[in-house]
Swiss-Prot record:
Its main location: membrane. It catalyses: 5-methyl-5,6,7,8-tetrahydromethanopterin + coenzyme M + 2 Na(+)(in) = 5,6,7,8-tetrahydromethanopterin + methyl-coenzyme M + 2 Na(+)(out). The chain crosses the membrane at residues 5-25, 40-60, 67-87, 132-152, 161-181, 204-224. GO terms for molecular function: tetrahydromethanopterin S-methyltransferase activity. It is found in: Cell membrane. This is Tetrahydromethanopterin S-methyltransferase subunit D. Pathway: One-carbon metabolism; methanogenesis from CO(2); methyl-coenzyme M from 5,10-methylene-5,6,7,8-tetrahydromethanopterin: step 2/2.
Length: 225
């Protein structure tokens, strides 16, 4: 029973952290790929899953270390992947397309205080990844990576699953939460300053329910092994 409670807490909390982290990630979808919207030019699930997979790999590399080391390593792996992706994206937007990173959803960047309106191309929602979106993306990577690492720890250390099976299940849980967040966002999001970020409570409830169900399934799956 103690093991079930531990798994329930870790997987549910990890799922919520992943879901919340996805809402911080600046995703612009197809419009961003054409430099007509702020964010990285890909889908929410793809970008979140990419950073999550990186976080799981870095967490698994420290699987014999204490809990906090695994957690922090997963967070750093996902955040580093997000930072590199956004930085390379900005290089392409600035030096390839020739447009400055800016947002049409705020008059001034909440972090730097720089004016945005003068740099937004008419008819677009901004372009590139401005400072506030960049910082938001790193925060999302830290949350998502640590959440994924928490799920991996529950499966590998607490339930005693093999590293391969724990990694596969943790990735599946990550994808499920990324899809839940994607449906909740409904398209593109620039980060924590985006009006869509206020939809977060609904996503947390959905992730809570999913985490409980996933915990029970994972626990009883481990008893069959």
């Amino acid at each position: 029973m103690d093991k079930l409670i531990a798994v329930l807490v870790l997987i549910t909390l990890g799922s919520i952290m992943v879901n919340v982290g996805v809402h911080y990630v600046p995703v612009g979808g197809a419009p961003a790929a054409m430099a007509t919207a702020t964010g990285v030019g890909t889908g929410t699930t793809q970008l979140a899953a990419g950073s999550g997979l990186t976080g799981l790999i870095t967490a698994a590399a420290m699987s014999q270390k204490p809990f906090l080391v695994i957690l922090w390593n997963g967070a750093l792996g996902a955040a580093t992947m997000m930072a590199i992706t956004m930085l390379v994206g900005n290089f392409i937007y600035v030096y390839g397309v020739g447009c400055p990173p800016c947002s049409a959803k705020v008059d001034k960047d909440p972090i730097t205080g720089w004016d945005q309106e003068a740099y937004v191309t008419p008819g677009t929602e901004g372009h590139g990844i401005p400072t506030v979106s960049f910082v938001s993306g790193i925060l999302g990577g830290l949350l998502g990576g640590s959440g994924g690492a928490m799920v991996y720890y529950a499966l590998y250390k607490v339930l005693g699953m093999s590293a391969a099976l724990a990694g596969i299940l943790a990735m599946g849980f990550f994808y499920a939460n990324a899809v839940l967040a994607s449906y909740n966002i409904g398209g593109t999001i620039e980060g924590y300053h985006d009006p869509k970020f206020t939809r977060l409570p609904k996503a947390v409830v959905c992730s809570l329910v999913f985490g409980i169900v996933a915990s029970v399934i994972a626990y009883y799956l481990s008893t069959l092994m």
